[in-house]
Curated annotation (Swiss-Prot):
Pfam families named among the record's database cross-references: PseudoU_synth_1 (PF01416)
Species per Swiss-Prot/TrEMBL record: Acidiphilium cryptum (strain JF-5)
Active-site feature positions: 53 (nucleophile)
Family the entry assigns: Belongs to the tRNA pseudouridine synthase TruA family.
Subunit structure: Homodimer.
InterPro entries: PsdUridine_synth_cat_dom_sf, PsdUridine_synth_TruA, PsdUridine_synth_TruA_a/b_dom, PsdUridine_synth_TruA_C, TruA/RsuA/RluB/E/F_N
Protein known as: tRNA pseudouridine synthase A
Primary role: Formation of pseudouridine at positions 38, 39 and 40 in the anticodon stem and loop of transfer RNAs.
CDD domains the UniProt entry points to: PseudoU_synth_EcTruA
Designated gene of the protein: truA
Amino acid sequence: MRRWALRLEYDGRGFVGWQRQENGLSVQEVLETAASRLCGGDVPDSVVAGRTDAGVHAAGQVAALELPDRLDARAVREALNFHMKPHAVAVIEAAPAPSAAWSPRFSAIGRAYRYLILNRSARPALRDGFVWHVKAPLDAPAMHEAAQSLLGRHDFTSFRASSCQANSPLRTLDRLDVRRDGETVVIEAEARSFLHHQVRNMVGTLKLVGEGRWRVGRVAEALAARDRSAAGPTAPPDGLVLVAVRYEVDPFPRN
């Protein structure tokens, strides 16, 4: 058997999230069931860079699992994609894992997320399920200014889910940019790792600034409070995409 690294994309709608659960279909189940077709029916255990929630999408998720030695990268990609039909999950790249110790989760040095807000009166037709529809005009520059107070290493208790299982609320936020692209407000976040719901809670809080309901400085005050009730609501999963995962030793060849 050989350990393979996989770069995946998926439409998070219709899934209970990445992780297997009893109450519905997960992305993990789709991938591992497809892989079992290549392993004589044995279901391999996968490891993933980020356990996305229900409704959250991915354009650059990274997973690893063991498959038979006889397969090459092209065969791994094509076979898994064939067996994952008709589900909205696809292997974009497959490559041998850099080493036996390499882990999609623990070897990652950075994760990048993008959140899209459709900021117009009319509801989305083509992008429904992929954006958060906000009718009230948003002040993107004010949102960006407020976001900068969250950069650096902080206790992000105010921005993590009450169900978060991380041992520590300390995280280092490397990037949180907000910009307008026509009718879309784009929020881009980067860090080595994030707490559960951290990105969605930051977006929900910044929306209050964009609507003028919060002044810019209140975001820093919410952070300092170390209290979930001091920050804004959790943004819906629809607009969130795991864009990329970075590694010191990247398993995927770059052209």
